Regions:
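Short, Lys/Arg-rich, polar N-terminal cytosolic tail immediately upstream
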Residues: 1-22
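Juxtamembrane helix-capping/reentrant segments at transmembrane boundaries
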Residues: 81-96
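Alpha-helical transmembrane segments of integral membrane proteins
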Residues: 22, 26, 54-62, 91-95, ...
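Membrane-embedded catalytic cores of phosphoryl/pyrophosphoryl-handling enzymes
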Residues: 117-209
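Membrane-helix exit/interface motif
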Residues: 73-77, 102-110, 129-137
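Helix-coil boundary and interhelical linker segments in multi-pass alpha-helical membrane proteins
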Residues: 39-57, 104-119, 155-165, 201-209
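Core segments of transmembrane alpha-helices
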Residues: 34-36, 94-106, 125-126, 145-151, ...
Length: 209
């Protein structure tokens, strides 16, 4: 049984409407979409974080487009398609690391605002924490949960109490969809979310003016 058919089989436990809704939630809350939303919301509501449109475009390119390039790249690289979903995840991890590292270097060399640098540090350290947990400690953490929790935590930081309820609702929907589709266990989702929280906390210590 292929990985795709196994995944489909696990979804058959849910009603068709429930599974379809869960797939839609996961599709619209992929990490690149969330960081894109984060950057656009901040650009139009906290304009002082950005020195100009160029800072926004660089942020979108490095935090959104570079990670997204992993998917077409997997189809272009010889033999990579045969590695299945696991190979796609590994390539996505590499592209995330490349994009987030480049964003951090861009921020350090161009002296972006403290708020924008906090975002760059959070994304860079989130990959480092996931690498430590998944590859070194062998404690499986959901990269999807980490990629969702990160921008939601940042939104709560920038908007205070006003951001907590909507962000909590989004994260609850993501958890529900992942559990419904059996993509992750509750423990993997929790560890992934805590990874984002740890990365954000470390970033506060590093990037605070």
């Amino acid at each position: 049984m292929t990985e795709r058919s196994q995944r489909k089989a696990t979804e058959e436990g849910a009603s068709p409407a429930k599974a379809k809704t869960a797939r839609f939630v996961r599709a619209v809350t992929v990490p690149p979409a969330l960081v894109c939303a984060l950057l656009l919301i901040l650009f139009f509501s906290r304009r002082s974080l950005f020195s100009g449109v160029a800072a926004l475009l660089w942020s979108l390119a490095l935090l959104v487009l570079v990670p997204l390039f992993a998917y077409p790249l997997a189809a272009l690289l010889p033999g990579w398609e045969k590695k299945g979903r696991e190979g796609e995840r590994n390539l996505a991890f590499v592209m995330n690391f490349a994009g987030y590292t480049a964003a951090l270097l861009y921020g350090l060399f161009t002296r972006v605002s403290a708020g924008l640098l906090l975002i760059y540090w959070t994304y860079f350290l989130s990959v480092a924490v996931l690498l430590l947990l998944n590859k070194v400690i062998r404690l499986r953490a959901s990269g999807h949960a980490c990629g969702i929790a990160g921008p939601l935590i940042l939104l709560c930081w920038f908007f205070g109490w006003a951001g907590i309820l909507p962000c909590a609702a989004v994260f609850a929907a993501v958890v529900w969809s992942s559990l419904t589709l059996k993509r992750h266990t509750p423990r993997e989702l929790l560890v992934g979310a805590l990874s984002a929280a740890a990365a954000f906390s470390l970033s506060l210590l590093i990037a605070s003016p």
